[in-house]
């Protein structure tokens, strides 16, 4: 039998096994929900339908406008149209229905459309603009920073671009900052509380369609109600009996009488602005009409033709929205995965032994000798192998 030598293992040389604690469960990293830009929009606006609808925060008058239109039109279709169809023609409710649809659609488009809000400057862009404006050295006490305006030439007319301290941008031509919505609006006309939104470059055509169609609808209802009461008062009945037989017509008559004049006047005023290619803001300030004292100043945006101005304001292509309110906000947390370090039990035992020695004041014991198992086989000579 072949001889084999074994080296005995000292049991004291073996380190006492230390129970390994169960691995800690790392907290699950829940990914954040991607937020859209309308959720962090800095302006004073309200968004609905996941950012598809935008209105001003102070839009409490809009339900009143919509309610008056629905109430007056509903009373007209219920109480006046049946009598007029019976005694005059069936075209009256058809004409009234077309005007009513135009009014409602144009009102909703004016109220729920982005008027032309300009996005605010990013911190990097704002810092770059501030460097261009302020004194780069600041050493000279007599140095005066340049005014926060820029001058551009449009059709041989100098136009000043003012710096907006809120949006941190130089406003483009015909742009103004609305204090109610807290936004810079391109081709700003005015803030209309009746529609609950600013009127600017992107929704002015809807606003003009709304006031013109509303003036036609109001005048149409006023004329039809007057005709209805006149027909009822014939035959010796009198106006009092006619009002008593149709009290809803009296309410319509009062509402239309007090509103038709203001609506017709507003439609005529904006027709003049469209023909001259002006805005309400420019007309009030007298920027190009000589009211500001500059009599020789002409409107650089006018095409010198009423037809061209009307086509430019009302029939041009619809500009896209610049705020991208349904886009996603870029994630700020750049989480990088790092390699996981795993402690081996042997290394942990060494650390525990050193820690116990330090606390007791004794030098740490030497590490245990490595566990060596030596398996020695006797060398078998060729002679033995051959004789075997």
From Swiss-Prot:
It comes from the Eukaryota. It is a multi-pass membrane protein. Residues 162-212 form the DHHC domain. The chain crosses the membrane at residues 59-79, 88-108, 206-226, 254-274. This is Palmitoyltransferase ZDHHC18-B. Pfam families: DHHC (PF01529). It catalyses: L-cysteinyl-[protein] + hexadecanoyl-CoA = S-hexadecanoyl-L-cysteinyl-[protein] + CoA. The keyword rRNA-binding does not apply. The gene is zdhhc18b. Coiled coil: none annotated.
């Amino acid at each position: 039998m072949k001889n084999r030598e074994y080296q005995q293992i000292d049991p004291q040389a073996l380190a006492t096994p230390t129970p390994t604690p169960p691995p800690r469960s790392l907290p699950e990293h829940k990914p954040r929900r991607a937020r859209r830009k309308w959720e962090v929009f800095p302006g004073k606006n309200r968004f609905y339908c996941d950012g598809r609808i935008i209105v001003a925060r102070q839009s409490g008058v809009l339900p009143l406008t919509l309610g008056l239109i629905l109430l007056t039109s509903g009373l007209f279709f219920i109480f006046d149209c049946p009598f007029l169809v019976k005694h005059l023609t069936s075209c009256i409710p058809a004409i009234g229905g077309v005007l009513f649809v135009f009014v409602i659609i144009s009102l909703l488009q004016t109220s729920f459309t982005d008027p032309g809000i300009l996005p605010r400057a990013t911190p990097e862009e704002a810092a770059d603009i501030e460097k261009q404006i302020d004194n780069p050295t600041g050493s000279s006490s007599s140095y005066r920073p340049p005014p926060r305006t820029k001058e551009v030439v449009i059709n041989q007319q100098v136009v000043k671009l003012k710096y907006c301290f809120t949006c941190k941008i130089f406003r483009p031509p015909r742009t103004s900052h609305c204090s109610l919505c807290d936004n810079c609006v391109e081709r700003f006309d005015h803030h209309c509380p009746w529609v609950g939104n600013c009127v600017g470059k992107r929704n002015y055509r809807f606003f003009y369609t709304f006031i013109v169609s509303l003036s036609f609808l109001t005048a149409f209802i006023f004329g039809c109600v007057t005709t209805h009461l006149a027909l009822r008062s014939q035959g010796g009945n009198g106006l009092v009996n006619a009002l008593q037989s149709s009290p809803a017509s009296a309410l319509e008559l009062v509402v239309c009488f007090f509103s038709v004049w203001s609506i017709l006047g507003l439609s005529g005023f904006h027709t003049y602005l469209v023909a001259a290619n002006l805005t309400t803001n420019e007309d009030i300030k007298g920027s190009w009409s000589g009211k500001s004292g500059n009599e020789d100043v002409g409107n650089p945006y006018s095409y010198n033709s009423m037809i061209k101005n009307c086509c430019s304001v009302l029939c041009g292509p619809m500009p896209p929205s610049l705020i991208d309110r349904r886009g996603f906000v870029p994630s700020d947390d750049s989480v990088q995965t790092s390699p996981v370090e795993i402690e081996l039990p042997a290394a942990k035992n060494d650390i525990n032994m050193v820690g116990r020695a330090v606390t007791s004041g004794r030098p740490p014991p030497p590490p245990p000798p490595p566990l060596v198992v030596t398996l020695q086989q006797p060398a078998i000579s060729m002679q033995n192998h051959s004789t075997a």
